[in-house]
Amino acid sequence: EFCKGVAYPMGQGPLAPALDALRARAEERGIPMTMLSITPPQRERLEREFPGRFAFEEDRDGWDYVYDINRLADLGGKKLHSKRNHIHRFDERFPDWMFEPITRDNVAECLALENRWAAARHGDEEGADILHEETVAVIEALYQMEALQMEGGLIRAEDEVIAFSLGSFTTPECFDVHFEKAFGEIQGAYTVINREMARYIRAKYPE
């Protein structure tokens, strides 16, 4: 199986051409045309414009991935003790690390990290197609952040970008992290970018 599904087409243009392209691509790969993480407004539009053509199911296995932003930003409580430990190790190794929003001035460094991240996994032939398409998607998202209404942040340590995160609002109350990349060999890098991105979004959009 190539993947579990695809995302709902972005933008405000007509849906039919985009859905036709997704359906043709799925047929080429011999997999069902499945869209994931459909929001209520997206479902309403699909039902309105394509009545009876889509079946909708709850994905209960994915519910664990919806978190309260305060929980991610503050990491309080016993259950998150291990995450705090990872961050403590990171702080010890990189006492002068900093978080920066992704801008035109530093986006090239994020692209460099993505290329290094993908190159380190290049030998995995079984997942080569998925890895390639993911890399293309990340690069496109970084280049088109403004057009896609995405927000991004990065972690800089020892004058090098070692982690970044990209996401967007799917509803006024829900921010979806689309991509989160870090050097896995650096303990705490993923945990720190996850926490700092949550803090950044919470501070920028307090309502």
Question: What do the PLM-derived regions correspond to, one by one?
Answer:
Residues R93, R202-E207:
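Short, intrinsically disordered, charge-balanced linker/junction segments flanking boundaries
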Residues I31-E49, R60-W63:
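Short, glycine/charge-rich beta-strand/loop segments that flank catalytic centers
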Residues P32-I38, V66, M98-T103, L154:
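A structural signal for short, well-ordered beta-strand segments and their strand-loop junctions
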Residues E140-K204:
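Glycine/small-residue-rich hydrophobic helix-like segments
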Residues G52-E126:
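Acyltransferase donor/substrate-recognition loop-hinge adjacent to the catalytic core
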Residues D105, E109-E160:
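Short, conserved active-site entrance elements at the starts or edges of catalytic domains
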Residues A21-R25, R89, R116, A141-Q144, ...:
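A generic secondary-structure signal
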Residues E1-P41, R156-E185:
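Conserved donor-binding loop and adjoining core beta-sheet/short helix segment
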